[in-house]
Design a protein with these regions (language model features):
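Flexible, solvent-exposed loop/hinge segments and secondary-structure transition points
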Residues: 1-114
Length: 114
C-alpha cells in the first residue's frame, strides 16, 4: 500500500535468519540491510530507529558503532517479543526508514506480537 518494494527478514533470538521475503523489484542491496536490521533489533531488544536517541551527540560512539558490521542505526528493525521474552527480530528495507518501520510493525501485528 505504500508503493515501495521491500525485503523482509526474520531472525530468531540468536540472530539466525529464519524467514525472508523479497518483493519483485526490491533493491538487491536492501537484502542484507533487512537481515541486519532484524539482527540488530534482536541483539539489543529495541527498534533500530531508537539508536539516534541512544547515541545522542556522542560522535565518537557514532563513529565506533558505524564500524561494526551488521549493526544498523536507522529505522526498519524491530525486536520480536512474546510474553516479555525476546524471541528474535524483524527487519524491513526498501523504502524510507519510516516506511520500513511501518511495514515491520504491520508484520508484528500479523504475527500477533504488537
Amino acid at each position: 500500500m505504500l508503493g515501495v518494494a521491500i525485503n523482509v527478514a526474520v531472525v530468531d533470538g540468536s540472530g539466525t535468519l529464519m524467514a525472508f521475503l523479497r518483493m519483485n523489484g526490491a533493491f538487491l542491496h536492501s537484502i542484507d540491510i533487512a537481515i541486519d536490521k532484524a539482527y540488530t533489533a534482536a541483539s539489543f531488544g529495541f527498534p533500530t530507529s531508537k539508536w539516534g536517541g541512544v547515541i545522542g551527540d556522542d560522535e565518537l560512539l557514532r563513529i565506533g558503532l558505524n564500524q561494526r558490521q551488521r549493526l544498523v542505526l536507522f529505522g526498519g528493525g524491530l525486536p520480536l517479543v512474546d510474553e516479555g521474552q525476546r524471541i528474535g527480530g524483524i527487519g524491513v528495507s526498501g523504502g524510507s526508514a519510516e516506511q520500513d518501520e511501518a511495514c515491520a510493525r504491520a508484520g508484528l501485528k500479523v504475527l500477533g506480537l504488537n
